[in-house]
From Swiss-Prot:
It comes from the Archaea. CDD domains: RNR_PFL_like_DUF711. Belongs to the UPF0210 family. This is UPF0210 protein MM_0081. Coiled coil: none annotated.
Amino acid sequence: MLINPKEILETIQMVRMEHLDIRTVTMGISLRDCSHPDIEIFNENIYAKITSRAKDLVRTTNEIQSLYGIPIINRRISVTPIAIAAESCRSRDFVSIAKTMDEAAKEAGVDFIGGFSALVHKGETGGDLKLINSIPEALASTEKVCSSVNVATTKAGINMDAVGLMGKVIKKTAELTSDRDGIGCAKLVVFANAPDDNPFMAGAFHGIGEPECVINVGVSGPGVVNAAVCELENPDLTEISETIKRTAFKITRMGEMVGREVSRRLGVEFGILDLSLAPTPAIGDSVAAILEAMGLERCGAHGTTAALALLNDAVKKGGAMASSSVGGLSGAFIPVSEDAGMIEAVKAGALSLEKLEAMTCVCSVGLDMIAVPGDTPATTLSAIIADEMAIGVINKKTTAVRVIPAPGKEVGDSVEFGGLLGSAPVMPVSNFSSETFIKRGGRIPAPIQSLTN
C-alpha cells in the first residue's frame, strides 16, 4: 500500500480538523511481587511500585505530544488483577487497596488506573469474592480507579453465579454514587473473554502472561473515518470499505510510532496497539455518524448491523496491514453516552437496547455506557449481562456490559457525567422478569466450538 504526498497532507488535516488523536497511552505494571498477608504492607508495596514505574509517564507523553503535534488525550495505568495480587491478604475487604491505587494514580498524574479486577469465569476464590464485594464502596470512595470482572470465556462457559452477583454489585454501586448519577457504574465493566492487554478503561488490567512493565496504546479516529467516507462521490460499499481500510492504515501507523517512541524513552517494552475506533461526545467524532454516512437515515435503522460489520472489518484489515502488534479489543466501540450520534439516535427512537445488542455481535466491545431506569431490578441487569456474555462465548469474541441503573431516573430522563463519559438518555428495558432464570445459578457450559485441540 503506497502512500503519496497528498495522503501525508491528509494526515495533518486529520489531526487539525477531524479529531484524530491518541486516546490513551496505558502503562501495564505487574504487582505479583507485591503480595503480602498484611494488607498495610501490601498497600505500601503497590504504591511504591506504581509510583516508581509510572513517575515519568506523563512527562514523556507530553514531550512526544509536543514533538509530533499529535494530541494524547489520556495517560493511564493498568495493574495485575487485584484479586490475584492480594489473594493472600488477611483482610475482610479490599477497599483500602482501591484507595491506595487512587493515591498512586494521583501521584503519577494519570487519568485512570485499572485492575481492581477479578477473573471468575469458572468460579470464585476467597480473594475474588472479597474484591467483588468491595467494588461498590471502592468505586464510590475513589476518583480514578476502574474495575472489571470477567465472568465468561469460550473455553469455560458462563459463570451464572457470578453474573447474578454482578447485577447486585452494579445496583449497589449506583446507589452509593447516586449523588453523581451513578457514575461508579461508568467505571465498572463485566466481561466475556477479557483481553490481557486492553489499554481502554474501564476494562484494562495487566494480564498474567504480560511482562513486568509494558506500554499499550489505544488510537481514536471516528471523525477521520467519517470525513473520508463523506468525501466519496456516490460510492458503492466496496469502495467505502477500501477507503476505511486505507484510513485505518494511516491511523494505526501514527499510533504505533507514538507508542514505540514512548516505550523507547521510558525503557519499557512496547506491547500492543488497539485499533478500536473510540468516539467522544464531540460533534463529528462519532461512530454512529460513519454508519449514517454509509446511507442510513439514523443509526439503528435496518441495515445498521451490516454497516457496522463492514466498518469493523475494514478497520481491522487496514490496521493489521500497518502493524504486527495489534491487540486489545481492536474494533469499533458503540458507547451510547460517549457518542453524539448514538445519543441522537436513542432520542429519536431509532436505537433500542435490543438493536444495540444485535450490533455487539459484529463489533467490540459490547453494551457500553447504557443508562437504564434506576428501579431496574438487579436480576434484570444480570440477565442483560448474561445475554451479552452468551454472544461473546458463542462467537469466540470479547463482549462486555457497562450499564448504569441511573438512581431516581426514568425513561426519557438523562444522566450527565461530563468529559469523555458524556451524557446518556435513559433507555427502556423489558418489563418481564428474568428473576427465576438468574436465581437458578450454576454454569452455562462451554459451547462445542470450544473443543479446538
